Amino acid sequence: MLNKLSAEFFGTFWLVFGGCGSAILAAAFPELGIGFLGVALAFGLTVLTMAYAVGGISGGHFNPAVSLSLTVAGRLPAKDLIPYWVAQVLGAIATAAILYVIASGKDGFSAGGLASNGYGELSPGGYSMMAGLLIEIILTAFFIIIILGSTSSLAPAGFAPIAIGFGLTLIHLVSIPVTNTSVNPARSTGVALFADTAALSQLWLFWVAPLVGAVIGAIIWKGLLGRD
């Protein structure tokens, strides 16, 4: 079990470091930097690369919503769910702390949102709580369908990380303006703890919505689409 939890810790670490790190350190440097497209691609690439690296050890979840969906779908034992969540959240917190230290090394540093998620005044585009709730539920549900479908016995072998990585990239392209894109409670928790905003007070949405979306996605796949 230790090797599985270690894989989830380091996999989540890499996801947050590559994804949130690109947003914090590179999105606006120099001037335009890598922008939304670059950040979206960074999140997708982190999942793709680490899924190939450690997916064979733990399943490559790196996300409490994914772990919940796999439990609902019967692919992850219920007894493993909470340990997976703990490893994922700790990995995200460790990464956020390191990113904070790195970012603070720049003159005139201000933590600001630190790539955290939010709605209302904390939404990049000023979107409401309801808009944030809906988009996070819908996109998480489809992310789960992509994951369950691409890793099923019906799909071509060996290509799942590519589909999942591109799926996460597309999700970010759609929703960065709305919530700064979560679909991952661990990712949201890590950076919220170090943000110099009210991100922590809005964190509930980025647990509730992805977990609800995960259950919906798993039910859709298991009940209507999948045969495995």
From Swiss-Prot:
Sorted UniProt keywords: Cell inner membrane, Cell membrane, Membrane, Repeat, Transmembrane, Transmembrane helix, Transport
Q: Where in the cell is it found?
A: Cell inner membrane
Could you tell me the membrane topology recorded for this protein?
Multi-pass membrane protein
Sites marked Involved in tetramerization or stability of the tetramer: C20
Q: State whether keyword Transport applies.
A: yes
User: Which GO molecular function annotations are given, in alphabetical order?
Assistant: water channel activity
Q: Where is this motif: NPA 2?
A: 184-186
Signal peptide region:
none
Give the GO cellular component terms, alphabetically: plasma membrane
Task: Name the major location.
Answer: membrane
Q: At which positions is motif NPA 1? A: 63-65
Catalyses: H2O(in) = H2O(out)
Is rRNA-binding given among the entry's keywords?
no
- Spell out where the chain crosses the membrane: 1-21, 46-66, 82-102, 129-149, 154-174, 205-225
Q: Where is this site: Selectivity filter?
A: F43, H172, T181, R187
Q: What is known of its domains?
A: Aquaporins contain two tandem repeats each containing three membrane-spanning domains and a pore-forming loop with the signature motif Asn-Pro-Ala (NPA).
Q: Which family does it belong to?
A: Belongs to the MIP/aquaporin (TC 1.A.8) family.
Q: What does this protein do?
A: Channel that permits osmotically driven movement of water in both directions. It is involved in the osmoregulation and in the maintenance of cell turgor during volume expansion in rapidly growing cells. It mediates rapid entry or exit of water in response to abrupt changes in osmolarity.
Q: How does it assemble?
A: Homotetramer.
Q: Which PANTHER family match?
A: AQUAPORIN TRANSPORTER (PTHR19139), MIP17260P (PTHR19139:SF199)
How is this protein named in the record? Aquaporin Z
